């Protein structure tokens, strides 16, 4: 069963999800280890550049397209649940400035490691991934990349609650331009699962919190 269905609709306890996160951590580690001999100074520079294209350039492109279609002004301050926030352009610039371009983790990249592309086999107690990207940000066939992107995609599901949003488990009201009331419907169990994830998940020397700028940009790239 896909993890997004389990996460949103099932009632599996936090200790089940700790096991899932350990499977994912092992999967990412294996993807780094099995490709270590393929990474060199030449292709690491290429991979570094394509990683930047995949996160930063794609976000800017998608946001600009959205602005043209919606006539929204991304330069004005926003408000969420009564809290004054910076403009969305300021948020984008801040996230880009906080990406650590020296902390790449190169390996075999899935490229879309969201919960809907991860299956859990209860009989074998294994995860199985489907629908890998297989191309880089420029459209070239490649299975190598920066695995920080894969971890950010998992963040997207666990911390960003992307699958809850897609399933309609939220309430959103826009009272005026970029002034929102927003609630995602979760229980205390999900909050505990998020805490376990943040405390236990690792990619090399990185924790999920280190990838929050990329995670935010992933959401903005989906506008």
Residues of each region from the PLM?
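Active-site activation/catalytic loop segments of kinase-like enzymes and analogous catalytic loops
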Residues: 127, 135-201, 216-223
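All-alpha amphipathic helical-bundle segments outside canonical DNA-binding/catalytic cores
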Residues: 205-215
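Conserved short submotifs of the Hanks-type protein kinase catalytic core
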Residues: 1-4
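Hydrophobic transmembrane helix bundles of membrane-integrated enzymes that assemble
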Residues: 70, 74-98, 118-119, 126, ...
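Active-site acidic catalytic loop and adjacent metal/ATP-binding pocket
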Residues: 93-145
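Conserved kinase catalytic-core helix
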Residues: 6-66, 70-73, 86-103, 109
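Short, solvent-exposed secondary-structure capping/transition elements
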Residues: 7, 37-40, 163-168, 210
């Amino acid at each position: 069963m896909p993890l997004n269905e389990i996460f949103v609709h099932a009632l599996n306890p936090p200790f089940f999800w700790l096991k899932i996160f350990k499977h994912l951590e092992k999967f990412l580690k294996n993807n780094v280890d099995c490709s270590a001999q393929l990474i060199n100074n030449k292709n690491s520079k290429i991979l570094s550049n394509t990683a930047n294209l995949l996160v930063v350039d794609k976000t800017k492109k998608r946001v600009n397209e959205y602005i043209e279609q919606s006539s929204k002004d991304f330069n004005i301050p926003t408000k969420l649940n009564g809290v004054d926030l910076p403009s969305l352009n300021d948020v984008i610039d801040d996230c880009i400035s906080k990406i650590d371009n020296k902390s790449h983790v190169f390996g075999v990249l899935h490229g879309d490691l969201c919960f809907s592309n991860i299956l859990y086999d209860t009989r074998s107690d294994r995860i199985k991934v489907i629908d890998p990207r297989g191309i880089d940000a420029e459209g070239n066939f490649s299975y190598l990349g920066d695995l920080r992107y894969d971890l950010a995609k998992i963040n997207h599901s666990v911390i960003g609650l992307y699958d809850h949003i897609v399933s309609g488990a939220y309430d959103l009201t826009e009272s005026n331009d970029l002034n929102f009331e927003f609630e995602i419907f979760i229980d205390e169990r999900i909050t505990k699962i998020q805490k376990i994830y943040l405390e236990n998940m690792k990619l090399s020397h990185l924790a999920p919190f280190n990838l929050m700028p990329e995670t935010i940009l992933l959401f903005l790239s989906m506008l």
